[in-house]
């Protein structure tokens, strides 16, 4: 099994660029930058895309330009065009249940209330069995404050932790392609930015 598509979830537009909900896009932006593979807008895939080589494998990158709750439209378009199965997709998203400075890989599972994941599961034919990379953003402590929280910008101290976790997650994703998922997972799950 190899990953053929890495998706970073986000809302489009400058007003959302620095918000917690866009942590997935921050990851893909950094990965594309590291691999010198600039993202370009591609209308037929409803997003910014690039093509990279990881561990000798051809991998597509995608940051949807749809709103978060329509992310599945972009993912399904690209998966269908390149004949990519759900278990060959890695979706990178912000995670309320992990603190800033932590990131974790996961295969399958529910959407945990995340509207981007919810739409992707739906558009992939109700198939939740894709890989996820969960970027911790913390929780506001009150479920009624979640929307404002994910659409807010983290303070500098939290942003630093999130950025460090993303940096480590990029390294571990590259390691996945060279040394396998188990080794990459063990390293990433032991990491906590201070």
UniProtKB/Swiss-Prot annotation:
The record marks 94 as: Stabilizes the basic form of H active site to accept a proton. One of its GO terms (molecular function) is peptidyl-tRNA hydrolase activity. PROSITE patterns: PEPT_TRNA_HYDROL_1 (PS01195), PEPT_TRNA_HYDROL_2 (PS01196). Belongs to the PTH family. GO terms for biological process: protein quality control for misfolded or incompletely synthesized proteins; rescue of stalled ribosome. It comes from Shigella dysenteriae serotype 1 (strain Sd197). The gene is pth. Its main location: cytoplasm. Monomer. HAMAP family: Pept_tRNA_hydro_bact (MF_00083). It is an enzyme of class 3 (hydrolase). The active site is at 21 (proton acceptor). Coiled coil: none annotated. It is found in: Cytoplasm. Its EC number is 3.1.1.29. TRNA binds at residues 16, 67, 69, 115. One of its GO terms (cellular component) is cytoplasm. NCBIfam families: pth (TIGR00447). It catalyses: an N-acyl-L-alpha-aminoacyl-tRNA + H2O = an N-acyl-L-amino acid + a tRNA + H(+). This is Peptidyl-tRNA hydrolase. Hydrolyzes ribosome-free peptidyl-tRNAs (with 1 or more amino acids incorporated), which drop off the ribosome during protein synthesis, or as a result of ribosome stalling. Catalyzes the release of premature peptidyl moieties from peptidyl-tRNA molecules trapped in stalled 50S ribosomal subunits, and thus maintains levels of free tRNAs and 50S ribosomes. The record marks 11 as: Discriminates between blocked and unblocked aminoacyl-tRNA. Keywords: Cytoplasm, Hydrolase, RNA-binding, tRNA-binding.
């Amino acid at each position: 099994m190899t990953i053929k598509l890495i998706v970073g979830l986000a809302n489009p537009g400058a007003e959302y660029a620095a918000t917690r909900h866009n942590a997935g896009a921050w990851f893909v932006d950094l990965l594309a930058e590291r691999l010198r593979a600039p993202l370009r807008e591609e209308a037929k895939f409803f997003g910014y895309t690039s093509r990279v080589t990881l561990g000798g494998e051809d991998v597509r990158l995608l940051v949807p330009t749809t709103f978060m709750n329509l992310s599945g439209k972009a993912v399904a378009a690209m998966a269908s065009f390149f004949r990519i199965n759900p278990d060959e997709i890695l979706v990178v998203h912000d995670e309320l249940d992990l603190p800033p400075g932590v990131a974790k890989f996961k295969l399958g599972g529910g959407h945990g209330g995340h509207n981007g994941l919810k739409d992707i599961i739906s558009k992939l034919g109700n198939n939740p069995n894709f890989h996820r990379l969960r970027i911790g953003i913390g929780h506001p402590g009150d479920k009624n404050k979640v929307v404002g929280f994910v659409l807010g910008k983290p303070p500098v101290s939290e942003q630093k932790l999130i950025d460090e976790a993303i940096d480590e997650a990029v390294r571990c994703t590259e390691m996945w392609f060279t040394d396998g998922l188990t080794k990459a997972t063990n390293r990433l799950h032991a990491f906590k930015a201070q």
